[in-house]
Amino acid sequence: MLKIDNIIAGYSSVPVLDGVSIHVGPGEFVAVVGPNGAGKSTLFKTISGVVTPMSGSITFEGTDLLSIPAAKRPHLGIAHVPEGRQVFPSLSVLENLEMGAFTPAGQAAWKSNIDQIYALFPVLKERSDQLAGTLSGGEQQMLAIGRGLASSPKLLMLDEPSMGLAPAIADFIFETLIEIRKQTKLTILLVEQRVAEALESADHGYVLEAGRVVLEGTNATLRADDRVRAAYLGM
């Protein structure tokens, strides 16, 4: 579904990603893990079109993604849940979700999508008229994920969804991602610093360090790798 091949990308001609290749198949849950500064968020910004790569290719369902303007990429079925949630604080919860349903697919499936979102996150239904800026951090993260789902995506990209959350709330977010995948067969690409939880949730993983993929494999393979265990799992 998503093929990233030998991407070099960065800012002001300074590369952050140095020849990164990542493939995500239909229905897969893929995690990209690594330390701060590894280039994980830059990878997502490159897929979304915020950052223009210096070289390499990205295709989505056979379409050359780099030839598509950033504003058009969500219409292909790509939803990006950004780092830091970035909800619209002066809009209500429901209005934020409506903002997510701006694609034709999202508009067509609005009723079923909103029912699914409220089933996954009942607190959003309870607070549908509340301003998003008054929600807790965990509730805002639920809203950000719900907003992504409202577009009826084929690929859901989540950038550090556990950032700044209490452990119990972060665990709930990971459990919900697994449930979303189980219910919808949605393709999920996750960037995350909580390596143990990310690899436990995903089918396949990539370890990104200093802008390069240094390891890849199934979740079981990576969790058993001595380098991953020592560097990220505290074993």
Where are these regions (language model features)?
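Conserved ABC transporter NBD signature motif
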Residues: 56-64, 76, 110-114
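Helical segment within the ABC ATPase nucleotide-binding domain
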Residues: 171-185
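ABC-type ATPase nucleotide-binding domains, specifically the catalytic core motifs of the NBD
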Residues: 12, 68, 93-112, 120-125, ...
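The feature captures the beta-strand-to-loop junction immediately N-terminal to the Walker
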Residues: 33-35
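ABC ATPase C-loop
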Residues: 148-149
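Conserved ABC ATPase signature
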Residues: 131-135, 139
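Helix-to-loop junction immediately C-terminal to a conserved catalytic motif
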Residues: 48
